[in-house]
Amino acid sequence: MFCTFCLKDRNYYMFKLFKDYWPTCTTECQICLEKIDDNGGIVAMPDTGMLNLEKMFHEQCIQRWRREHTRDPFNRVIKYYFNFPPKTLEECNVMLRETKGSIGDHEIDRVYKRVYQRVTQEDALDIELDFRHFFKMQS
């Protein structure tokens, strides 16, 4: 059997992992306090460059808040608002480039911090193998 491995850059891999891990995490909108669903939400990056995924918002909630207030609900000066998980690779690239670190001690922050550190700092190679194209699925 002949196998071909396609190695992608770390940002692409992080983009994929952000989406893959999202359904395993839960957080709530810090404005309406309802659960953020599987489609994700908005995370604000303060001028410190530190992400805190526990402090996320529904898109509609933060849009309404921003129309009525000059600062975010935690009185931070916000540099960027990102979809999380990122909707595009380009958005993921900007978020990764601008992020200086991650803060927060809730489970969602710990999960993504571990994933980020593993992909960006460890000397390891992750290879994704998809054998569905090679083997017929039995009914």
Swiss-Prot record:
Nuclease: present as a keyword of the record?
A: no
Query: What InterPro entries would the database entry show?
Result: Baculovirus_U-box/Ring-like, Znf_RING/FYVE/PHD
What SUPFAM superfamilies is this protein classified in?
A: RING/U-box
What is any Pfam family matched here? Baculo_RING
Give each disulfide bond as a residue pair. none
Keyword set, alphabetical order: Host cytoplasm, Host nucleus
User: Quick one: where is this thing mainly located?
Assistant: host cell
The subcellular location is: Host cytoplasm; Host nucleus
Q: Name one GO cellular component term.
A: host cell cytoplasm
Keyword Aminoacyl-tRNA synthetase annotated: no
Report the protein's function.
Answer: Plays a role in nucleocapsid assembly.
Protein's name according to its UniProt entry: Protein AC53
Which organism does this sequence originate in? Autographa californica nuclear polyhedrosis virus (AcMNPV)
Q: Print the organism lineage.
A: Viruses, Viruses incertae sedis, Naldaviricetes, Lefavirales, Baculoviridae
What gene codes for this chain? AC53
